[in-house]
Amino acid sequence: MQEPPLELTIEPPLSQETFSELWNLLPENNVLSSELSSAMNELPLSEDVANWLDEAPDDASGMSAVPAPAAPAPATPAPAISWPLSSFVPSQKTYPGAYGFHLGFLQSGTAKSVTCTYSPPLNKLFCQLAKTCPVQLWVRSPPPPGTCVRAMAIYKKSEFMTEVVRRCPHHERCPDSSDGLAPPQHLIRVEGNLHAKYLDDRNTFRHSVVVPYEPPEVGSDCTTIHYNFMCNSSCMGGMNRRPIITIITLEDSNGKLLGRNSFEVRVCACPGRDRRTEEENFRKKGEPCPEPPPGSTKRALPPSTSSTPPQKKKPLDGEYFTLQIRGRERFEMFRELNEALELKDAQSGKEPGGSRAHSSHLKAKKGQSTSRHKKPMLKREGLDSD
């Protein structure tokens, strides 16, 4: 008797009956052994399930070859961006050297229209962003061939000297009209010189620009280099209102120092106004100011700028003077003026005794003058009556 064929198209694969048969094949410890492989092959499975079981070992072997992904590391907050610090602080002391190296600047006023101006008493250059700043190089004798000029910026205050001076992130990303030689993070650039080299020191991380030294042209006594400062002194993330000093050094082909000079730089929107303000503050600081007494909260007044000392008022003395006046009208005018002054002194209480005595003396004199004036009139009347 033949068994009726299984209707695989009607029963879904891995139905409840098939699952129960598989479950009964499992041992007590729920681990399949190699003896059950023949029984698994004799199970009545559909064609697609059989193909899936045949391909499963290959997929498992392929998956085992691929390393399992590592567990993701716990998320940590990203550290704040910090610029590298430099352990080397270049000297800013003036050193003329054997060639008498020193700097010079063009004379300019403090008008609002100026884009670059130099203050001799402050030794400070005020300029606008990316504007031409001519710096003159003076030497007594020509340096050897291969000499170069290096410009480097450092912070003026001691607490910031180890930080590298660089542009702010905003100006680094802004496109500028450079020749493509200068890196975007460099603050100082040289205008119109294709031989300029922008260097980043590997040890100190400081930025500098080096150009070959060129002797003065015919009819000129100095060499002029045009520098540009590509970030404002007030930019956040850059200088951040911290004053900087630009150091100009004269070096030979081997890097030996031949001369050094420096000056302070402020990059601002109105160089003339800022120079005028800082020079006025510098003059005020130079004048001696009286110190307030201890415990006093009032501000001391600035000293007077006049050269002549204030004259002290002399107290009124008790002397009397005789003044000869021609004409009675003029005499009466001076007399009233004198009486008014005496009355004012008496009311103010400066010298009450002296003023009273003086006023009584004036009244007595007035009575005498009146009597003297009337006596001749009486004599005249007597003569007329006679």
UniProtKB/Swiss-Prot annotation:
Residues 1-44 are annotated as: Transcription activation (acidic). Residues 275-288 have a biased composition (Basic and acidic residues). Its cofactor is Zn(2+). Keywords: Acetylation, Activator, Apoptosis, Biological rhythms, Cell cycle, Cytoplasm, Cytoskeleton, DNA-binding, Endoplasmic reticulum, Isopeptide bond, Metal-binding, Methylation, Mitochondrion, Necrosis, Nucleus, Phosphoprotein, Repressor, Transcription, Transcription regulation, Tumor suppressor, Ubl conjugation, Zinc. Residues 249-287 are annotated as: Interaction with E4F1. The modification Phosphothreonine is found at T18, T277. Residues 266-273 are annotated as: Interaction with DNA. Residues 358-377 have a biased composition (Basic residues). Residues 1-313 are annotated as: Interaction with CCAR2. There is a cross-link at K284, K285, K344, K350 (Glycyl lysine isopeptide (Lys-Gly) (interchain with G-Cter in ubiquitin)). SUPFAM superfamilies: p53 tetramerization domain, p53-like transcription factors. A motif (Nuclear export signal) lies at residues 332-343. The modification N6-acetyllysine is found at K112, K298, K314, K366, K374, K375. One of its GO terms (molecular function) is molecular condensate scaffold activity. Zn(2+) binds at C168, H171, C231, C235. GO terms for biological process: cellular senescence; circadian behavior; DNA damage response; entrainment of circadian clock by photoperiod; negative regulation of cell growth; negative regulation of DNA-templated transcription; nucleotide-excision repair; oligodendrocyte apoptotic process. GO terms for cellular component: centrosome; cytoplasm; endoplasmic reticulum; mitochondrial matrix; mitochondrion; nucleolus; nucleus; PML body. The modification N6-methyllysine is found at K363, K365, K375. The modification Omega-N-methylarginine is found at R326. Residues 361-380 are annotated as: Basic (repression of DNA-binding). Multifunctional transcription factor that induces cell cycle arrest, DNA repair or apoptosis upon binding to its target DNA sequence. Acts as a tumor suppressor in many tumor types; induces growth arrest or apoptosis depending on the physiological circumstances and cell type. Negatively regulates cell division by controlling expression of a set of genes required for this process. One of the activated genes is an inhibitor of cyclin-dependent kinases. Apoptosis induction seems to be mediated either by stimulation of BAX and FAS antigen expression, or by repression of Bcl-2 expression. The N-terminal and C-terminal disordered regions undergo liquid-liquid phase separation (LLPS) following homotetramerization and activation. Post-translational modifications, such as phosphorylation or lactylation affect the ability to undergo LLPS. The nuclear export signal acts as a transcriptional repression domain. The TADI and TADII motifs (residues 17 to 25 and 48 to 56) correspond both to 9aaTAD motifs which are transactivation domains present in a large number of yeast and animal transcription factors. Forms homodimers and homotetramers. Binds DNA as a homotetramer. Interacts with AXIN1. Probably part of a complex consisting of TP53, HIPK2 and AXIN1. Interacts with histone acetyltransferases EP300 and methyltransferases HRMT1L2 and CARM1, and recruits them to promoters. Interacts (via C-terminus) with TAF1; when TAF1 is part of the TFIID complex. Interacts with ING4; this interaction may be indirect. Found in a complex with CABLES1 and TP73. Interacts with HIPK1, HIPK2, and TP53INP1. Interacts with WWOX. Interacts with USP7 and SYVN1. Interacts with HSP90AB1. PANTHER family: CELLULAR TUMOR ANTIGEN P53. Belongs to the p53 family. This is Cellular tumor antigen p53. It comes from Felis catus (Cat). The lineage of its organism: Eukaryota, Metazoa, Chordata, Craniata, Vertebrata.
